[in-house]
């Protein structure tokens, strides 16, 4: 029941996705080939959210792996968890998108998209009651951004009433992989604003900072970064995968987190932060977890929530935690830091509990926040976009794939609208209802 179909597109999406499957296989007691060897019934109870049961006590992820070039796929297939996935679910092209959004969205990706949708349909038909889709991708490249957003809109057409969650790696302020990142990201945002229900924004630079500052890793690898992301993804999906006192699912999360349909871009945090090798040496308490998870240095997106206000946020605690303790803690946070929360949404913190902690920890917590400060990211990308677009730099790569300049202009203004919407709600107060009075319907009785 309540299954989720997972898609991973492009190099980044496949690497993050593989780390995620590695993490949750471990939590459910599955080995690298999907055979169950766990100890607790609770690991099995809701395994079918992410896994199909095959013959011989083997579980197969409901995952569709997509890329426009075979390289990353081969790496996944020959990696430690390569035997986990169903071989038919690897869908790849040969040409690559070359960091070009238009190739991913209109030419190369569009040729491959029907094959992917066949696999998605087959996975969806295997579900008793499909809850929704989650996709991991980056917004800066070509495949994850261009083809990823194409898949999202196609799936949206076919399954309009199912949830669509995306884990999107957004371009970071200082670390850039490609020159045309601002173009790709803006074109993707244009799509995500319309077609995604919840987007968890992750950003490499923030992850680097966490690795270096908190985990004291002098030279973090992508493996370390993906380990952090998979911890958050595992945390967000916890209450779907394990029984808990206060369960939430993708839809409940969205209902509690998204006050206005376009504003569905979340910051995420996790506590206690540990590197794969080192585990926490001291007993962690709920106040400490809360402290760490709400610390701006621990946010996995490079924007500081102190520059904005939280519309809503959600916390997921795992392990042996007392419900009352968590609620008191949350209440006190809201009272102490009331300036960081908008006052026109009275109880804007949602809490979920799950009794099973992640592997190697006693208790942990995951934080998801819908903060107006996320506009920093969009504003930054928008400025870089405008700087290049004004000179029409690199545009020929996109127009030669059949794109129109209009589309760039639309994406740019959509992104600017998003920034100003966030700003508008950041400045709104509980009692400035006067400006809307004249629009209120008049009761003629």
Swiss-Prot record:
Subunit description: Dimer of alpha and beta chains. A typical microtubule is a hollow water-filled tube with an outer diameter of 25 nm and an inner diameter of 15 nM. Alpha-beta heterodimers associate head-to-tail to form protofilaments running lengthwise along the microtubule wall with the beta-tubulin subunit facing the microtubule plus end conferring a structural polarity. Microtubules usually have 13 protofilaments but different protofilament numbers can be found in some organisms and specialized cells.
Full protein name: Tubulin beta-1 chain
Top-level lineage group: Eukaryota
Ranges of compositional bias, category Acidic residues: 429-445
Keywords in alphabetical order: Cytoplasm, Cytoskeleton, GTP-binding, Magnesium, Metal-binding, Microtubule, Nucleotide-binding
Subcellular location: Cytoplasm, Cytoskeleton
GO BP term, example: microtubule-based process
Cited PANTHER family: TUBULIN
Lineage summary: Eukaryota, Fungi, Dikarya, Ascomycota, Pezizomycotina
Natural source organism: Hypocrea virens (Gliocladium virens)
InterPro entries: Beta-tubulin_BS, Beta_tubulin, Tub_FtsZ_C, Tubulin, Tubulin/FtsZ-like_C, Tubulin/FtsZ_2-layer-sand-dom, Tubulin/FtsZ_GTPase_sf, Tubulin_C
Stretches the record annotates as Disordered: 425-445
One family name in Pfam for this protein: Tubulin_C
Binding site for Mg(2+): 69
Assigned protein family: Belongs to the tubulin family.
Cofactor dependence: Mg(2+)
An example molecular function term from Gene Ontology annotations: structural constituent of cytoskeleton
GO cellular component, one term: cytoplasm
Function per UniProt: Tubulin is the major constituent of microtubules, a cylinder consisting of laterally associated linear protofilaments composed of alpha- and beta-tubulin heterodimers. Microtubules grow by the addition of GTP-tubulin dimers to the microtubule end, where a stabilizing cap forms. Below the cap, tubulin dimers are in GDP-bound state, owing to GTPase activity of alpha-tubulin.
Annotated binding of GTP, by residue: 11, 69, 138, 142-144, 204, 226
Gene3D superfamilies: Helix hairpin bin, Tubulin/FtsZ, C-terminal domain, Tubulin/FtsZ, GTPase domain
